[in-house]
Amino acid sequence: MRVLSSPQQYLFNLETTSSQEAKRLWRRKIKESWDYECAYCGSDNHITIDHIVPRSKGGADFTKNVVCCCSSCNQDKSHTPWEEWYFSQEFFSLERYAKIKEMQLG
C-alpha cells in the first residue's frame, strides 16, 4: 500500500478536495501501513500518530516523520528524541527499530 508523502499530496492528486479530509485520509493510510500497531511497542490499543521529530522541535507532517503509535508510548515519549527514548524502553525491538529507520529513509 502506498502512503503519499504528506496530507497535501491527497489534495494535489485529487483524492479529496478538502484539506481536513486529506489529513484524515493521510493519517488513516499511516495507520494502515503499520497494521494499526504501535511502531514502538507493537500494541494495538488506542492508536494515534506520533511525530518522530516532534513539531515543537521542527518536525513536520511528512510521512517520513510520523509513525503509528499507541497513546501510552506517545505520551511517554513526549518531546524526547525518539531514539534516546526508544533505546531505554524494556520493549525495545531491533526489528521495529529497523522498520522505523527504513521508513525514515524512504
Cite the ranges covered by each PLM segment.
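Short microdomains enriched in Cys/His and/or Lys/Arg
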Residues: G58-S72, Q89-M103
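Short cysteine-rich loop/turn motifs with clustered Cys
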Residues: Q20-T48, C70
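Intrinsically disordered, low-complexity regions enriched in Ser/Pro/Gly/Gln/His and often acidic
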Residues: S18-S19, R27, Q75-S78
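Residues that form generic nucleotide/phosphate-binding pockets
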Residues: K29, S33, W85-S88, I100-M103
